[in-house]
């Protein structure tokens, strides 16, 4: 099993970066091996409510959303910055397809909740 926790795949900014990652994962898995990762499910209601708004947890920061780039920029009060690039469910499924992996399960939360319109998280499990 290869597991990418903590939304780590969202640090890859382009389709090409993600495709290479998925292809390398597929090449590294044994036959029938599993690949699991999580990513937030973009919600425009949440984004519009917190865009540009200061928050204190987990660290003092402000998020700025760029919908045209599928990107959220995080600026810490101490000056640090970072970005995450979200993807849709179908973009993730397309990456599985081009890498020759097949979807085993897709959940809407870490407790195995079904994915629905209220889900805030994608939990993917794929097989080679």
Residue spans of the language-model regions?
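Accessory recognition modules or surfaces
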Residues: 1, 61-76, 111-127
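A short SAM/SAH-binding and catalytic strip from SAM-dependent methyltransferases
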Residues: 1-16
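Short, hinge-like loop/turn segments at secondary-structure boundaries
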Residues: 2-3, 52-56, 122-123
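Short conserved AdoMet
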Residues: 13, 30, 128
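C-terminal lobe and adjacent flexible extensions of AdoMet/dcAdoMet transferase-like proteins
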Residues: 89-128
């Amino acid at each position: 099993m290869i597991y990418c926790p903590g939304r780590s795949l969202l640090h890859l900014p382009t389709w090409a970066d993600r495709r290479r990652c998925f292809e390398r994962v597929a090449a590294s898995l044994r036959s029938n091996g599993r690949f699991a990762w999580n990513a937030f499910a973009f919600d425009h209601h949440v984004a519009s409510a917190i865009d540009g708004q200061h928050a204190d947890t987990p660290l003092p920061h402000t998020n700025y959303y760029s919908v045209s780039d599928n990107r959220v920029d995080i600026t810490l009060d101490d000056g640090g910055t970072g970005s995450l690039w979200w993807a849709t469910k179908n973009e993730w499924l397309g990456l599985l397809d081009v890498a020759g992996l097949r979807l085993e399960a897709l959940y809407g939360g870490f407790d195995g909740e079904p994915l629905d319109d209220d889900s805030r998280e994608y939990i993917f499990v794929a097989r080679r």
